[in-house]
Amino acid sequence: MQTRSSSSPSANHRRETQLQIADPTSFCGKIMPGWTVVNRPRSSNNGVVDTYFIEPGTGRQFSSLEAIHRHLAGEVNDRRLTRAGSFFQDKTRVYEGSRTKQDHCGVEYASKGFRLPRGWSVEEVPRKNSHYIDKYYVERKTGKRFRSLVSVERYLRESRNSIEQQLRVLQNRRGHSKDFRLPDGWIVEEKPRRSSSHIDRSYIEPGTGNKFRSMAAVERYLISVGNITLDSVSMVHSERLPLLMNRNGIRFQSEVIDPNPPKKVKWVLTGSGGNMFTANVRGSNVSSLVKHTWSEAFVSLIEDRS
């Protein structure tokens, strides 16, 4: 009794003869030197031949040049990606989403010159029952993982925009210039909070009624409309008038220009709360009225910057 082998020598021979090594020079400029190109007829014997590209050293097979591009673009080891040869001149961008030919019109590409920054790594995870390898781009500092370079680029761009926004907010919150004082005619509206001893101040521009919540906002506004310069800021000094109280409990005070501001004032903080000071100008103590006015100005300055 004879048994028939499931894989006879003649069948193996036919399978080997069907694999044809193609001339790699026909793909010159599209693949790196050393790659092997194999033409493999389909088992249906309908004359269709599939082309496979074999990576030297690893033996990995790729069914398209696009798959090779994605594979090579993701190979980094904590260094910036480098691109060499004419292979990288044209189609070097990596896309995410559907990879079928019908959907290529809707794919999203990373920028042509995009590189992984330092501190990133690439993980390769082979799929089960498949020759396909999934790549994950990992930010080591945070542990965040991304499936494509375009996702990494989008994440970095959004993070950069967020940092720039925070910097703009911090710049807007900066205090006003040290020597800045309200111009003549401006009104300060002080309104005590109901559930707190804190007093909210608003600075009102005469004529327009524009209201600002801080001295820094007033200074930025005056600079933007061209009503103030750095020289005028450094020369402006003001003396506060007594506060006025209306029926609603809102206090108002105006600012006037002191035509002869002192060049130097020697002062020392006093009082239990540290909100009073004694002042000496040209060897003489200032009057109690002036000290009281300056004390209010000093407390207001501290609260504006807090």
Swiss-Prot record:
GO terms for molecular function: enzyme binding; methyl-CpG binding. One of its GO terms (cellular component) is nucleus. The gene is MBD7. Residues 1-21 are annotated as: Disordered. This is Methyl-CpG-binding domain-containing protein 7. Gene3D superfamilies: Methyl-cpg-binding Protein 2, Chain A. Residues 163-306 are annotated as: Required for interaction with PRMT11. Keywords: Chromosome, DNA-binding, Methylation, Nucleus, Repeat, Transcription, Transcription regulation. Expressed in leaves, buds, flowers, stems, siliques, mature seeds and roots. Methylated by PRMT11. It comes from the Eukaryota. Disruption phenotype: DNA hypermethylation and transgene silencing phenotype.
